[in-house]
Amino acid sequence: MLFSRSILRGMPKAGIPKSPLALSASRNLRLANSVRFASDAASSPKSTTSKWKILKRTTLGLFATAVVLYGANVYRFRHPDPHQPLPDPSKKTLVVLGAGWGATSILRTIDTSLFNVIVVSPRNYFLFTSLLPSTATGSVHTRSIVQPIRYMLRHKSCYVKFYEAECTDVDADKKVIHIKKTTTDGVDLEQEIKYDYLVCSHGAETQTFNIPGIAEYGCFLKEIWDAQKIRARILHCLEQAQFKDLPAETRRRYVHTVVVGGGPTGMEFAGEMADFIEDDLKSWYPELADDFAVTLVEALPSVLPMFSAKLRDYTQSLFDSSHIKIRTNTALKKVTAENIHVEVKNPDGSKQEEVIPYGLLVWAGGNRARPLTKKLMEGSEEQNNRRGLVVDEYLKLKGYKDIFALGDCTHTAYAPTAQVASQQGAYLGQLFNKLGSLNFEKPSEDRHIALGDEMDSSTLISLANEKHASTKVFLPFKYSHQGSLAYVGHEKAIADIEVPWFGKQLHASGALAFYFWRSVYLSELYSLRNRTNVTLDWIRVKLFGRDISSL
């Protein structure tokens, strides 16, 4: 039996004939399988191709959308509304003094349909002061960081009157300000302007502490013409150092930059100057390459006191590697045409005098009150601080009716920075919007409060808060610190960033902080025009370097 099975197993099997229907089904099955295998083999490249098409179309769509939005913004910039409603005599008049951070923040926030708004400023533009150190060395053009004040005013809902003039006096009893403008012929034109509400945001002057010679021989860094003066002085010293064969000591003096002041402005300029020297001047003036020097002088024991100790140490080490000499505990006493005289405090407490030669002296000191601020101080006993105007929790000027103040002309618990002035301006803009709503709502249960012409802003605020005690229509100003930024050279920056949900500060330094610094400053620039120009300036410097023409 086993033998027969093995024989059968080895013999070929007889073929079993299949029906035509079975043969057709078999052929169809093989054809379907071959089609399926072919589609599987081709599915991978086709899928990849379709994904790339989707990505390409999405990218093109986003780019086209960005171009359209950019074009719309540019068109809006170039074509303000030619039919702004004119001032309404029935509305109250709000006068804003200045065109700085605080004033422009008010103008951004306020609803001009609620008031007849008048702006008075000696300059007809807003200056982005945070980038002034960059303009002094040519990293950014001066016109890239200014915005005409009329651009802001022409894009408001109602007409805003602007006077390019200086406010010389305030008559608080008559509610009148006196303004003066000097014509090109040297003639002084004067005018009076009546107000219902007045906002003093006229800023401050550079504090010199009565140091002899600082105003005559030093360069400040507060206005656009200061940056232009510094740049002209840099190039003048360079060419003068090469005019003829000079003693080595004299040549080194011409190319020695001294910066007095260890705050953010002084540190940023020192960093920008070091970049200018390393990236450009050493290439175009190779014979002076070994003579360039930058020294930073600070009277306090350390620089950048508003930053953390970790970031101060980082800046110190970076400046050391950049050959920027930081001299702390060194107070400026006198300035002459060629030297500065300083008093150095030694570790043992003793003091010694020292003379430092210089070619360019940049003074980055503090602020002092303008003449108008001093007059307002003298006009009320409640103005008892000589450093600036004293205000209450609503930024109302103490001792005066319907006068508010903000920014560098005031003395508060906050540092005199652009960040503080911007938040104060936004707060006052919202406060005036609420006051305007109280004054002009129809009908309103609050209207009987507002109709009293003799009621000043303090009375209105108090009555409104009493009537709505649960919600408090008017809240006191509260500053929210967002952090501190400073550029320290070599495409590096430092940043102390406040993170509310994190509960503490984040400290950043280096290249990452540098790009964060740039992104923040770009976002803070007033308009798309400013952002475009500054971005193009940065690209220009990266590609071609800084210009060294004496223009």
Swiss-Prot record:
The keyword Transcription regulation does not apply. Its EC number is 1.6.5.9. NAD(+) binds at residues 255-291. One of its GO terms (cellular component) is mitochondrial membrane. Its main location: mitochondrion. Coiled coil: none annotated. FAD binds at residues 93-123. GO terms for molecular function: NADH:ubiquinone reductase (non-electrogenic) activity; oxidoreductase activity. InterPro entries: FAD/NAD-bd_sf (IPR036188), FAD/NAD-binding_dom (IPR023753), NDH-2 (IPR045024), NDH2-like_C (IPR054585). Residues 1-37 form a transit peptide. The keyword Hydrolase does not apply. Keywords: FAD, Flavoprotein, Mitochondrion, NAD, Oxidoreductase, Transit peptide, Ubiquinone. Pfam families: NDH2_C, Pyr_redox_2. GO terms for biological process: oxidative phosphorylation. It is found in: Mitochondrion. It comes from the Eukaryota. It catalyses: a quinone + NADH + H(+) = a quinol + NAD(+); a ubiquinone + NADH + H(+) = a ubiquinol + NAD(+). Belongs to the NADH dehydrogenase family. Catalyzes the oxidation of NADH. This is Probable NADH-ubiquinone oxidoreductase C3A11.07, mitochondrial. It comes from Schizosaccharomyces pombe (strain 972 / ATCC 24843).
